[in-house]
């Protein structure tokens, strides 16, 4: 239900655009009481389907239902959006493009975004593709070789640091090294990461389904071998 954290993603963008730590802290629920209260309130609304939910009546229509209580709170806070795919957006866009392109008969090549999503369309198995691997060591992002693969694949790269230009307004690093990331949880409205990075891939699912399956594991206190085995049993590696 993280897509219902739209107001908090807007606050996170303000945090990440800050010029110094004092300004950033005003938008940080870990450092500011008002921001913490807001994060808890929005998360409580986001968790409850009675407060916010989507309905798909058909004919390419979608209806967003928002409770009177949430509408009143949003008006008081000056919110302009309830819904935002934020860092997840390109996973859904790439899947849409891949399905559209395949529907027109194209089955070669890859579609990728700079923020860590890849969809390989090649069903021939005749060509190898590569994905670069990185690891954060201290404050340095180090190259750790490449992953070679073939055949249809969806790749999702979770990372707790800025890995490219799209991350500029999604991450913020304080002077003491503390990092804020876009991986907000609907449980409390705060960001959580289990490791500096996690790369998952699947030959069975698109980017969006792969992301959704692995997201909660990446938000845990630490990466669990058992949870990764569960993902593997679902053909997500």
Predicted regions and their residues:
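Mature catalytic core of soluble alpha/beta enzymes
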Residues: 1-237
């Amino acid at each position: 239900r993280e897509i219902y954290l739209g107001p908090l993603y807007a606050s996170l963008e303000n945090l990440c655009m800050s010029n110094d730590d004092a300004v950033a802290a005003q938008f940080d629920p870990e450092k500011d009481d008002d921001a913490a209260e807001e994060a808890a309130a929005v998360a409580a609304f986001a968790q409850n389907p009675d407060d916010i939910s989507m309905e798909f009546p058909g004919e390419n229509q979608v209806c967003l239902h928002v409770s009177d209580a949430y509408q009143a709170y949003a008006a008081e806070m000056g919110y302009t959006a309830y819904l935002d795919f934020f860092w997840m957006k390109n996973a859904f866009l790439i899947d849409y493009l891949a399905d559209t392109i395949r529907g027109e008969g194209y089955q070669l090549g890859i579609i990728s975004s700079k923020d860590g999503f890849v969809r390989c369309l090649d069903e021939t198995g005749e060509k190898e593709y590569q994905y670069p691997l990185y690891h954060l060591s201290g404050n340095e992002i180090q190259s750790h070789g490449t992953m070679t693969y073939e055949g249809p694949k969806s790749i999702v790269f979770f990372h707790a640091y800025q890995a490219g230009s799209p991350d500029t307004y999604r991450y913020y690093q304080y002077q003491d090294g503390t990092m804020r990331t876009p991986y907000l949880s609907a449980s409390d409205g705060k960001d959580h990461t289990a490791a500096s990075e996690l790369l998952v891939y699947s030959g069975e699912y698109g980017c969006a389904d792969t992301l959704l399956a692995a997201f909660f594991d990446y938000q845990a206190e630490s990466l669990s071998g058992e949870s990764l085995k569960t993902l593997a049993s679902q053909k997500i590696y």
